[in-house]
UniProtKB/Swiss-Prot annotation:
Tissue: Detected in brain, thymus, lung, heart, spleen, liver and testis (at protein level).
Gene (name only): Ralgapb
Its biological purpose: Non-catalytic subunit of the heterodimeric RalGAP1 and RalGAP2 complexes which act as GTPase activators for the Ras-like small GTPases RALA and RALB.
Name of the protein in question: Ral GTPase-activating protein subunit beta
Modified residues (Phosphoserine): S359, S421, S710, S1275
Length: 1484
């Protein structure tokens, strides 16, 4: 204000008017001269005060010489009468300007202004502190001050020069006494009130008669800033400024404005003749004369004045501590008095017509001389009971030495009802500010900077935002400090203990650092907070608050609704109105000159995140306090109707959607996306619980309210005209068609539309937003709400289009980050397909998805719109990257193997078959089966087939060829039990499969049998005549001789015997034939019996076409093995590697460690012990645990358990002993510690991931852990196929094993003993890199900083870290930073506040949970689980060393093929197929 004017400091310093010529002489000379000269003058005044004769001095020369002597006399010690005579003479002479007397020299009477100017300069010497005789000096100083006071009041001929000298004189004597540090009982302490009172009174008189020039105002302001460590300075300033304000309001706002009543004593300080213009000018200058009153809260600023710096070094040259200055201990009280004075001014401008009983400017209090109980009332404004009062102050009486200055406040009743505190129980109505009060902006322009900064005193920001020095303090810190000052009957504490307040009332405040916060400044801060609250609550309807203030409130208020402030929900509608002004506005042009628009939008979004759960949580609860319109004196009754929280839902949804449409900042956009999943899931769960009926009841109010209350902004200065389509506010104009988004289905559909539209337009270039949008779509796919097929198809099609665009980008733009976006899109596609498998029933959707898979694997589509179909064999594979190809292959596997098949009958814990070679051997009833009975083949270098040809002897039909095949591929281990079926199922039950059809019974009656002798030739032969030729052949008897006759006879006899024998046999045969049945089983034709022994492995391979010659040949120009190869299982280590392959999971696995932290806890042991009993934790914590997953038994669980030593076990003991033991121990209250991973864990799994939730707790003894380890090893004794090293005993450094008694208590109670179940240094499959997430339930939000994450690192071991290749020391230093932590703080409202640490990295924040978000009880478990899934997926995308599960399995299969391939020639291979296996090893 006076920056261009010079100060008068140099003029004062160079002025030598207070020196005398006698100062040049020795001290003895000056003393003697002064005593001799002054005594006659003083005695003349003392002996004849009434009839005083003429003065002894007649000429100007005499007077000037005498004044030189008196000037020196004023510097003498007070042990004599000389100084008193000097004071008497000068106080008599200065009355020449009031009423000339004979005792006054004639030259003085003739030129009083000239002489009195010199006298005033000489009187400065009196006020120089003496070492002794303090009471005498005080009496003399008061005499001079009274004379000065009378001079200023009664003189009418004082010239301007004299006024200026008088003002400088008063400034100098005040500076002499008040600028140095106050000495207890010193002259400054006793004269401070009178000194500053006379200065201000004379200054006001000067303003009336001779208005001071700007240099005087500037000098006064600079000097007053050096005296502020005196309570009287602030007290007198408060008196004067209140008196001036009372006069100012009287003519500024007219007689109808409520008068600001001040005590008559204070009102008399203002000269009656002071005109209105002078009052206005004087008021503004006096307002700033105290400089910034917030400096009173900073001892370093107050002690930086020159006088303090002079005394900062003591005589020995050693610096003193600031705490050694007792006067600085008064600063909290002085600060409070300054804020009280400003509070009174604000009340006056607001038109609160009656001052509060404790708001009048109080008198100074000497804390050193008064008892503590007499301390002033420092009740914060929030807790005051305001009564109608008129403040009258008793006259101040001043003592000489030890008189304490007190004041008496008399209260008089009034007929009106004044301002009451919000928590009062009386029926007094809340006072209304005056209708003609000034605007909020005007009041804030005057006092806002001071009040904001005062409310910000000793506050420490924890949100990392640097506040510009020109910005006002944050409204959230104001309200928080206000809350900390009024909590727990703080008013009674203030009344009893003054401004001292226990820090316990602010322990729960996250903004303040209790170790640095001086509790005795709370009174002043609370006064400023209350004043600001009254200012903002007095805003008129339709009044526009300047963007500078509105943006400051919003920018600094994100945690406002997260801190359990009582009654804070009353302001929810007004914050919603402010958000409706900011978030749908894309440019924010009117705020740009005050704040960063991006930061303003971010703060607004944070507030929105904290408001979204309120409508669902409070539902139809009505707000009984409706502030809007109450202070405007409007006749409109629309604001008087209580509104329900549920009616605010549509407004919040509209703001959310509008913010998404206008947001451009990536971080802000991700926060909005997280909020969308929050509101959609919460709505879905609420409707699923049957609450949609209640929601429907408030639907009419909801829609009508959104049109009335949203149409006019109470915070943005919008038009007060009725809402019309042309004059709608920006939010409604932008969101006019979103009326159906209040239901879960409507929210889901609109979210899908908005996100998919922007995913393929604005967001596809931004990786962070793209990942967040894909995570949102994945979360929306899991929301259990029925929506149309077209909307779901839109989401899938959008993701496919996104992948096409990213893959088609030019090669120079391809990078790892781009490929990470494509991989994330494939993962999102898998989520949608697994959650909605019926989508692939649509031909178009199936075609689009398979084309995208083809694009990812091969790099191009076979069919494009502009090209002919290009077949796979003709295409050259050129995927975007191997990561993209792997993701596409995983999607194809998901489509072919998981869709519609998850969860399997074996449960969601494992998508694989819970069968391996050991299981088949264990449950087979054939003693000849062992592990060598399996044939092992590999198909296409990617699938291992383990074939068991022998039937299992169970329900399989032994009459048919059967083969049991264990298929180990990239997607896991699957068991197929197959039989060769040639007949229908019904024919299998018929045992006459190979019996021919029955024949008819033959007829034995064959008719008559005739004996007919058959001729060799027909009879006609005998009738043919012979010819000569016939006679040429003689007859037999003609040529037979005797010898021949004998032979002939012999032959005839033999023939006869033969004929007889044959006839006998024929008869015998006919007899036997007649005795036989028909048909004859000997001769009957029958089918061959079925085969009983089969080489089913050869049949299986042959039937599937794997035994062709081409399949056994080495591919030309390739290092790949043939399509079919055999493995040699007799090579040592084969079954270890097979078990090693089975340990590789077939889907990602994550681990979450959950801790419970009670107030004040800092050590890991305290935190771990909390979960040992359900009585130690809040009931909502146990409910939260059960919402994360279901309980599983670690010993029988085939999935991930949180530690590699107990995970993926399929051959554990399955008898009833464990369950019986659990039943016995279940009666004990073990709380959440039952899920510590030793016996049980909480588990969640879907088709694409599995999560183990472990609640670490102290372990009773290491012996129990070792015993459980031994029992686990016994139960797994049949796991022949697990790696051999798994069956080794734990490696320790103990010389004598199994001696655990020597362990100290810390080792026996170490919760990390479960780590010792896994032998140190054991090689395990490359399961990493892993991401371990910690979830911490904190009862007190302040304890987040004390969470000992580094100490708990040993408790969150999963065994996977042993597979890391990096050194242990390196991992120990970086591991803590790699662990994301989700803090959950339960609020008193039943909602939950979220704090996330360590979840940001290369890919920025992870949704849906966002730092600062408020979550409902229903959606907490789902959102935490979804956030964990997204965090771990992000970490895997970020890791360079991560490989998908199917890739790791494929690599291991390739390794097994290379190590155990049976390199046989084709003949040898075929020969081996016909050989039996396993028989030779039956005994092994």
């Amino acid at each position: 204000m006076y920056s261009e004017w010079r100060s008068l400091h140099l003029v004062i310093q160079n002025d030598q008017g207070h020196t005398s010529v006698l100062h040049s002489y020795p001290e003895s000379v000056g003393r003697e001269v002064a005593n001799a000269v002054v005594r006659p003058l003083g005695q003349a005044l003392g002996h004849s005060p009434v009839s005083a004769s003429q003065s002894l001095l007649y000429t100007d020369k005499d007077v000037k010489w005498t004044m030189e002597v008196i000037c020196y006399g004023l510097t003498l010690p007070l042990d004599g009468e000389t100084v008193k005579y000097c004071v008497d003479v000068y106080t008599d002479w200065i009355m020449a300007l009031v009423l000339p007397k004979d005792s006054i020299p004639l030259p003085v009477i003739k030129e009083p202004n000239l002489y009195i100017q010199s006298i005033l300069k000489h009187l400065q010497n009196l006020f120089v502190p003496r070492q002794e005789q303090g009471s005498s000096q005080i009496r003399l100083c008061l005499q001079v001050l009274r004379a000065i006071q009378k001079l200023a009041r009664e003189s009418s001929i004082m010239a301007r020069e004299t006024w200026e000298v008088l003002l400088l004189f008063l400034l100098q004597i005040n500076d002499i006494l008040l600028a140095p540090p106050t000495v207890q009982g010193g002259i400054a302490e006793n004269l401070a009130e009178k000194l500053i009172g006379v200065l201000f009174e004379v200054w006001l008189l000067a303003c009336t008669r001779c208005f001071p020039t700007p240099p005087y105002w500037k000098t006064a302001k600079e000097m007053v800033a050096n005296w502020r460590h005196h309570p009287a300075v602030v007290e007198q300033w408060s008196k004067v400024i209140c008196a001036l304000t009372s006069r100012l309001l009287r003519f500024t706002y007219g007689p109808s404005f409520p008068p600001f009543k001040v005590p008559d004593e204070d009102a008399n300080l203002i000269p009656p003749e002071m005109d209105n213009e002078c009052i206005a000018q004087t008021w503004f200058r006096f307002l700033h004369m105290l400089s910034n009153p917030v400096d009173l809260s900073n001892p370093a600023v107050i002690s930086s004045t020159p006088k303090f710096q002079e005394q900062f070094l003591n005589v020995s040259g050693m610096p003193q501590e600031l705490s050694q200055y007792p006067c600085l201990k008064h600063l909290p009280q002085i600060f409070f008095r300054a804020m009280r004075g400003i509070s009174c001014l604000v009340d006056a401008f607001l038109g609160i017509s009656r001052p509060r009983s404790d708001s009048a400017p109080p008198t100074p209090v000497n804390r050193l001389s008064m008892p503590q109980s007499a301390a002033v009332n420092t009740t914060p404004p929030h807790n005051r009971r305001h009564r109608a009062v008129t403040v009258n102050k008793a006259t101040m009486k001043t003592s000489t030495v030890t008189t304490a200055h007190t004041s008496k406040v008399q209260h008089q009743a009034s007929s009106t009802s004044p301002l009451s505190s919000p928590n009062q129980t009386s029926s007094e109505p809340r006072p209304l500010p005056a209708p003609r009060r000034p605007k909020v902006n005007s009041i804030l322009n005057l006092f806002g900077s001071w009040l904001f900064d005062a409310a910000f005193v000793h506050c420490k920001l924890h949100n990392g935002i640097n506040r510009d020095s020109s910005m006002t303090a944050s409204f959230i810190q104001i309200l928080l400090s206000y809350k900390s000052s009024i909590a727990t009957q703080a008013s009674m504490e203030f009344r009893r203990k003054g401004s001292q307040m226990s820090t316990d009332t602010m322990v729960s405040n996250p903004v303040f650092d209790a170790s640095e916060f001086p509790d005795n400044y709370e009174a002043g801060r609370a006064e400023a907070c209350g004043t600001l609250c009254r200012i903002f609550c007095s805003k008129k309807t339709g009044e526009e608050i300047l963007p500078a203030y509105l943006s400051s409130v919003i920018l600094n208020s994100p945690p406002l609704f997260c801190c359990d402030l009582k009654g804070i929900d009353v302001v929810v509608p007004y914050f919603i109105s402010a958000l409706e002004t900011i978030l749908p506005d894309r440019e924010l042009s009117k705020f740009k000159s005050y704040v960063n628009p991006t930061e303003l939008r971010r703060s607004s979004i944070n507030i929105l995140l904290s408001l979204l759960p309120l409508p669902h949580h409070f539902g139809t609860v009505r707000s009984e306090v409706v502030l809007e319109g109450k202070f405007s004196n409007d006749d409109s009754s629309s604001y008087d109707k209580p509104i329900t929280f549920l009616s605010l839902k549509l407004r919040l949804v509209n703001i959310l959607i509008g913010a998404l449409q206008t947001e451009t900042d990536p971080n802000n956009t991700q926060m909005i996306l997280g909020a969308m999943l929050n509101i959609v899931q919460d709505s879905a769960l609420l409707e699923a619980l049957g609450c949609q009926m209640e929601m429907g009841g408030g639907e009419n109010n909801l829609k009508s309210h959104s049109r009335t209350n949203s149409g006019i902004s109470s915070a943005s200065g919008g038009s007060t005209e009725p809402t019309t389509p042309d004059s709608e506010r920006p939010a409604q104009a932008l969101l006019r068609d979103y009326g159906s988004t209040d239901s879960a289905a409507g929210l889901l559909i609109r979210s899908i539309h908005l996100v998919t539209q922007r995913l393929n337009s604005q967001w596809r270039q931004d990786m962070s937003i793209s990942l967040a949008a894909l995570e949102l779509l994945s979360g929306l796919a899991k929301v259990k709400v029925m929506v149309d097929l077209g909307d779901r198809k839109r989401a899938i099609s959008s993701v496919c289009s996104y992948i096409v665009y990213q893959c088609s980008r030019p090669a120079p733009l391809h990078s790892r980050d781009l490929h990470s976006m494509i991989v994330a899109a494939f993962q999102c596609l898998c989520v949608w397909l697994t959650e909605h498998p019926d989508m692939l029933d649509e031909k178009d959707c199936l075609k689009e998805v398979l084309e995208i898979v083809e694009l990812g694997i091969s790099g191009s589509k076979s069919k494009n719109s502009e090209q002919e179909v290009k077949y796979k064999g003709d295409k050259e594979p050129n995927p975007a990257s191997m990561r993209v190809k792997d993701a596409a292959e995983a999607t194809l596997t998901c489509i072919m193997q998981l869709l519609g098949a998850f969860p399997s009958p074996s449960g969601p814990a494992s998508p694989c078959s819970l069968v391996n070679e050991t299981t088949l051997i264990k449950y087979s009833r054939l003693p000849t089966i062992n592990k060598h009975s399996f044939r092992y083949f590999v198909l296409d270098n990617s699938v291992i087939l383990a074939m068991l040809e022998q039937p299992l002897g169970n329900e399989q039909n032994d009459f048919f060829p059967s083969v049991t095949v264990l298929v180990r591929g990239m997607s896991g281990r699957l068991a197929w039990a197959q039989q060769l079926c040639l007949l229908p199922r019904g024919a299998k039950a018929n045992q006459k499969l190979f019996v021919p059809e029955p024949r008819p019974v033959p007829k034995n009656d064959v008719g008559f049998k005739y004996s007919v002798k058959h001729r060799p030739f027909p009879e006609e032969v005998d009738k043919i005549p012979f010819v000569k030729a016939d006679l040429s052949i003689p007859d037999l008897h003609e040529i037979v001789t005797e010898e021949l006759e004998e032979r002939h006879e012999k032959l005839r006899s033999g023939m006869a015997q033969q004929i007889a024998y044959e006839m006998h046999l024929e008869q015998q045969s006919e007899g036997e034939l007649q005795k036989r049945s028909f048909p004859d089983p000997v001769t009957d034709c029958k089918p061959p019996p079925p085969a009983q022994e089969f080489q089913t492995a050869r049949l299986f391979l042959s039937h599937f076409g794997f035994l062709s010659l081409e399949a056994l040949k080495e591919p030309a120009n390739s290092r790949l093995p043939p399509h079919l190869i055999a493995l040699d299982s007799t090579i040592p280590g084969f079954f270890d590697d097979i078990g090693y392959l089975d340990l590789l999971p077939c889907r990602p696995f994550d681990t979450v460690f959950i801790f419970y932290m009670k107030p004040g806890q800092k050590t890991n042991q305290e935190i771990l012990k909390n979960v040992e009993s359900s009585r130690n934790v809040q009931p909502h914590f146990l409910e939260f645990l059960l919402s994360l997953g279901w309980s599983v038994d670690v010993g029988r669980h085939p999935g991930w358990t949180g530690h590699v030593s107990t995970s993926w076990s399929i051959n554990s003991c399955d008898d009833g002993e464990g369950s019986e033991q659990d039943e016995v121990t279940s009666s004990e209250d073990v709380g959440a510690s039952i899920f510590n991973g030793q016996k049980k864990v909480l588990y969640y799994a879907d088709a694409l991931t599995e999560i183990a939730f472990v609640v670490p707790s102290p372990v009773e003894s290491l012996t129990d852990s070792l015993e459980s380890n031994i029992s686990d090893q016994d139960s797994d004794s049949n796991m022949d196929l697990m790696p051999g090293i798994l069956k080794q005993p734990p490696l320790t450094l103990e010389l004598v094993p199994n001696h655990t008694d020597s362990l100290n208590s810390s080792q026996r109670l170490s919760p990390s003993s479960r780590m010792k179940k896994l032998p140190q240094g054991r090689p395990v499959p490359p399961l990493g890199p892993e991401t371990r997430v910690s979830v911490v339930w904190v009862e007190r939000y302040d304890d987040i900083e004390n969470f000992p994450l580094s100490d708990l690192m040993t408790e969150i071991s999963t065994g996977v870290e042993t597979t890391a290749n990096s050194s242990t020391s390196l991992r120990s230093t970086t591991l803590e930073k790699e662990v994301p932590v989700i803090f959950i703080h339960p609020l008193n409202t039943g909602l939950f506040r979220i704090k996330i640490q360590g979840a940001t990295g290369k890919f920025n924040m992870v949704i849906p949970l966002v730092d600062g978000m408020i979550v409902s009880r229903r959606a907490l478990g789902f959102l935490v689980r979804q956030t964990v899934i997204n965090i771990c997926r992000r970490k895997r995308l970020e890791s360079d060393s991560y490989s998908p599960p199917h890739v790791r399995r494929k690599q291991k299969i390739t390794d097994i093929v290379n190590k155990y391939r049976n390199k046989q020639l084709e003949p040898e291979f075929y020969t081996a197929l016909f050989q039996e296996v396993g028989l030779k090893n039956c005994s092994s």
